[in-house]
């Protein structure tokens, strides 16, 4: 999924495929969840973004970074439009996480080692660390949080 192919060599079909999964998917999920949430008195929308959409695009993958940037702004707009409906919308921004996708993107040992030089904690994050953020945002502990950004990246965006 993550290639180092220059923008001018990309196809519209590649671009659209990534946008369909990452930004259109979030739009459709949100669009269809809002009426049910409103009818039940509120809810919490949690979008999984990426540090690539936070302004730290180390992927060199323009479609992916742009799609995650779209999710970032969409989450904020949703928050402002639906706060009065008691619907909260927040986004989580994972850094490199120990998943099949990250390992596939960095299949060369040098690539992973190089990426980790830009993570102060020096390791991949764990899925359970992202899950903890999701649980927090879904809980009443975050009841006054909407339009927020929870960055879970081992310090990568602080560099």
Each predicted region: which residue ranges?
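Short C-terminal tail/terminal secondary-structure segment
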Residues: 55, 134-135, 146-159
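Active-site loop-to-helix junction immediately N-terminal to the catalytic Tyr of the SDR YXXXK motif
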Residues: 10, 56-65, 77
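Active-site helix of classical SDR
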Residues: 30, 67, 75
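Residue(s) in the substrate-gating loop at a strand-loop-helix junction
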Residues: 50
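Alpha-helical segment proximal to the catalytic Tyr-Lys
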Residues: 35, 80-81, 143
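Short, small/polar-rich loop/turn modules that mediate ligand/substrate recognition or access, typified
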Residues: 83-88, 145-147
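Substrate-binding pocket helix/loop in short-chain dehydrogenase/reductase
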Residues: 6-7, 11-16, 111, 115
